[in-house]
């Protein structure tokens, strides 16, 4: 594995204040065994960026540039969410604030279930997918952010299952495994999830 020049700084800021995401990323970076310190932006008192992009890619870049500008360090940001085709792709980029208040997982899950009620009259399977876009910038004005994308396909349950994970994990059903995402361990989830897929592409970019 080669070491990109930004490794020379010895640290990489993770542009997120979401505790669930931070925990997953710390585990993923631990598994990658990269010779660089990962610093969650909260440790540097960096506030959340204003996510006013219209796509996962735009918001990931916005967050990465924001963290890099304040910290003066390379930064990686994740923008992710769940997309449901019968809802036109919603919640999409608004996943974290689907019910109005940012980060209210219970309310977001309840709204998604309610919005899907009209589509369940005949017992139809509701397909959904988790999307993760990672953006890596070496500095705040980096003209060529690196982008890594992962997509995880599944179905949306009629009621929550499982106690692990965060966000919409309790509603995300994996038919091939017969479990919800919230019934997977961190290690199991990281091997197959949208975030795990994107991180694997990041790892491969270093080779």
From Swiss-Prot:
EC numbers, comma separated: 3.6.1.66
Metal-binding keyword on record: yes
InterPro entries: dITP/XTP_pyrophosphatase, ITPase-like_fam, RdgB/HAM1
One BP term from GO: purine nucleoside triphosphate catabolic process
Active site: 79
Swiss-Prot/TrEMBL catalytic activity: XTP + H2O = XMP + diphosphate + H(+); dITP + H2O = dIMP + diphosphate + H(+); ITP + H2O = IMP + diphosphate + H(+)
Superkingdom of this protein's organism: Bacteria
Keyword tags: Hydrolase, Magnesium, Metal-binding, Nucleotide metabolism, Nucleotide-binding
GO function term, MF aspect, one: dITP diphosphatase activity
Binding site for substrate: 16-21, 80, 166-169, 189, 194-195
A cellular component annotation (GO) from this entry: cytosol
Cofactor note: Binds 1 Mg(2+) ion per subunit.
Keyword Transferase: no
Cofactor or coenzyme needed: Mg(2+)
Binding site for Mg(2+): 79
Leading EC class: hydrolase
Xref: Pfam families: Ham1p_like
Family: Belongs to the HAM1 NTPase family.
NCBIfam families with a match to the protein in the record: RdgB/HAM1 family non-canonical purine NTP pyrophosphatase
Entry function: Pyrophosphatase that catalyzes the hydrolysis of nucleoside triphosphates to their monophosphate derivatives, with a high preference for the non-canonical purine nucleotides XTP (xanthosine triphosphate), dITP (deoxyinosine triphosphate) and ITP. Seems to function as a house-cleaning enzyme that removes non-canonical purine nucleotides from the nucleotide pool, thus preventing their incorporation into DNA/RNA and avoiding chromosomal lesions.
PANTHER family referenced in this protein's UniProt entry, alphabetically: INOSINE TRIPHOSPHATE PYROPHOSPHATASE, INOSINE TRIPHOSPHATE PYROPHOSPHATASE/HAM1 PROTEIN
Assembly notes: Homodimer.
Name under which the protein is recorded: dITP/XTP pyrophosphatase
Organism: Acinetobacter baumannii (strain ATCC 17978 / DSM 105126 / CIP 53.77 / LMG 1025 / NCDC KC755 / 5377)
């Amino acid at each position: 594995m080669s070491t990109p020049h930004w490794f020379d700084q010895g640290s990489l800021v993770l542009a997120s204040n979401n505790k669930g995401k931070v925990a997953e990323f710390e585990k993923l970076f631990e598994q990658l065994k990269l010779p660089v310190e990962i610093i969650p932006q909260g440790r540097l008192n960096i506030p959340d960026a204003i996510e006013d992009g219209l796509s996962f890619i735009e918001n990931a870049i916005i967050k990465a540039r924001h963290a890099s500008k304040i910290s003066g360090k390379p930064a990686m940001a994740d923008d992710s969410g769940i997309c449901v085709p019968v809802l036109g792709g919603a919640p999409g980029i608004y996943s974290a604030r689907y019910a109005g208040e940012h980060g209210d997982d219970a309310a977001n899950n309840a709204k998604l279930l309610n919005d899907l009620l009209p589509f369940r009259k005949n017992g139809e399977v509701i397909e959904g997918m988790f999307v993760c876009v990672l953006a890596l910038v070496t500095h705040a004005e980096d003209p060529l952010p690196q982008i890594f994308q992962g997509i995880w396909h599944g179905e949306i349950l009629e009621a929550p299952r499982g106690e692990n994970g965060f966000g919409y994990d309790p509603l995300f059903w994996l038919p091939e495994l017969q479990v919800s995402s919230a019934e997977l361990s961190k290690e199991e989830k990281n091997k197959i999830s949208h975030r795990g897929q994107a991180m694997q592409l990041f790892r491969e970019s270093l080779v």
